[in-house]
């Protein structure tokens, strides 16, 4: 990351911290609050290498924020498809030190996990079958179509085009962006959004072609 981006991340974390909010409520000035973030103090922090997953240390609150930013935040939710029963729910590393549930609170761009909705809409609306074939070649949707402000020409993840004909089954299994672009062009964004809503994601989603490769953000709970 560039220094400017790191500084933005740190500033956002400082201002959203309990310390900042608490001192603001007490009427402390911004100068006083920032000074308190630079004062060393005893604290207990999360530690992977400890049996208790904790260690006692001395650091500034600012250093503690920087320390916690080094941990990868992830989440997992496992559900039994036949019943909908939740079998596992892991919202983070350690709730005592990371009181944030990434399953339901943390949203991220869904990326290729959104592609099955595009394929489902094409199969439902256009009566395609998994055995139908489309070419893996450069494909553009012109400006003005489907509400596009400018031409949309997605590339495959490797930046290459094989020129081969792929079945929908193969294209989805291998996450071929060019085939997904052709499908959303043919079926249109609206039926894709409708099928997403019908499957339980009842939220506003922009009806634009780029949702096929997903610019929208969802949490793990939404996607299950």
Question: Where are the predicted features?
Answer:
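Generic alpha-helical secondary structure signal
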Residues: 4, 166, 190-191
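Peptidoglycan glycan-strand catalytic modules in the bacterial/periplasmic cell-wall system
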Residues: 94, 162-165, 172-177, 184-188, ...
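Sec-exported extracytoplasmic/periplasmic mature domains
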Residues: 122-127, 139, 173-177, 185-189, ...
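Mid-domain, small-residue-enriched loop/turn segments at the edges of structured enzyme/sensor domains
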Residues: 148-156, 160, 187-224
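Extended, non-catalytic substrate-recognition/exosite surfaces adjacent to catalytic cores, especially
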Residues: 1-145, 156-157, 169, 182, ...
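Membrane-targeting and insertion segments and their boundary/processing signals
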Residues: 87-88, 163-166, 170, 196-200
